[in-house]
Amino acid sequence: MMTKNERRQPSWPMIAGVAAAAALVGFGAARGLGSPSGAEVSKLAAAPEKAAASAPAAEPAEVRIPGEYLAAANIAVEPVSAGGVGSVLLAPASVAAVPGSEAVIASRAAGAVLRIQRKLGDAVRAGDVLALVDSPEAAAMAAERKVAQARADLARKTYERESSLFQQGVTPRQEMESARIALDVAQAEVQRAATVAQAAKVSSDGRSVAVVSPIAGRITAQSVTLGAYVAPQAELFRVAGSGAVQVEAYVTAADTSRIAAGSDATIVLANGAPLAGRVQAVTPTVSGSARAATVVVTPVDANSGLIVGEGVQVRLHTKAADANAMSVPEDAVQNLDGRDVVFVRTQQGFRPKSVLVGSRSGGVAQILSGVKPGEQVATRNAFLIKAEMNKAGGDDE
């Protein structure tokens, strides 16, 4: 016998045609056979009741939904979490760059912006020149470098002469050693001046200072104008690398003791899409006007698509007081025919499962029974599956 799940859902034109044919057959039979007797009427009325009493309870229907529809309808699927409502914290968070993957780029000397070679949104490589600053300090550093080099050349010639005279027995050893010490000092001064000029990115002609990106990435901020005067260490560009990002969630000081590094977390995007994450660290102190502690969460998927500065939410899973408790996002629980259900993912779609719901708090519902931890259930936009199931049930009727 073909079950409900195996039947193809008929189209509305087919249903209308079948209904019309049944009406004609019934009308002809009524005319040909006449009205039934009273005993027959009683027997016919009792037959449906007897059939209904003997029929077994219908199994939950499965709604067949292709994977392409899930993406188009923005339906999210998440595992049932182990732990009750009290073991889940919903905290505001923001996406930040991992230390070392973002650079604030400033001018090393004061001056006027001579040239801008990169603009906002451009991709850059490590060592690329973003701008040139015409600076008197650059000329001073270049001159100091040349003076130090000239003194070193003079000290080298003096040492060579004193060394030759000492070997000929003309001058004592003390004068040769003094010349050698003077040469060492001059060479150290050359190295110092060259290091200062190199750190400031002084050009070869000594007229300008180059603003250079230390990392590869993309320019995400630009606060420089051609011809404008800039002060030393003033931010001109900001470059974000293409590396991993982290999510910084903010919790109260009382909640920090409930969160441990390595515990599971769920990152909830602005559109409701969930991303699996893991707690990397919890700051032991609070800071800021909100007096909140920071919980650092890293996405499990390195290619998560998170953008630095994006606002998100994080569900932090703490240790549950009841080992048998479970929880799901509140959107996952739907009311179907007067009962609370969740839609469990199957190979071809979803199947409703009746659940016993406990408390609800912070967008999370506690599940007392009906499912097992780890089962994949529909969360965001689960009501669309309910609508499809109601539609399928109406078509079957």
From Swiss-Prot:
Coiled-coil residue windows: 137-195
Keywords: Cadmium, Cadmium resistance, Cell inner membrane, Cell membrane, Cobalt, Coiled coil, Membrane, Nickel, Plasmid, Transmembrane, Transmembrane helix, Transport
Membrane topology: Single-pass membrane protein
Family statement: Belongs to the membrane fusion protein (MFP) (TC 8.A.1) family.
Keyword Membrane set for record: yes
UniProt xrefs under InterPro entries: Co/Zn/Cd_resistance_CzcB-like, CusB_D23, MFP_Cation_Efflux, RND_pump_MFP
Naturally occurring in which organism (per UniProt): Alcaligenes xylosoxydans xylosoxydans (Achromobacter xylosoxidans)
Name used for this protein in its record: Nickel-cobalt-cadmium resistance protein NccB
This protein's record includes keyword Cytoplasm: no
Location within or outside the cell: Cell inner membrane
Gene Ontology cellular-component terms listed: cell envelope; plasma membrane
Role according to the record: Component of the NCC cation efflux system that confers resistance to nickel, cobalt and cadmium.
Record field: transmembrane: 10-30
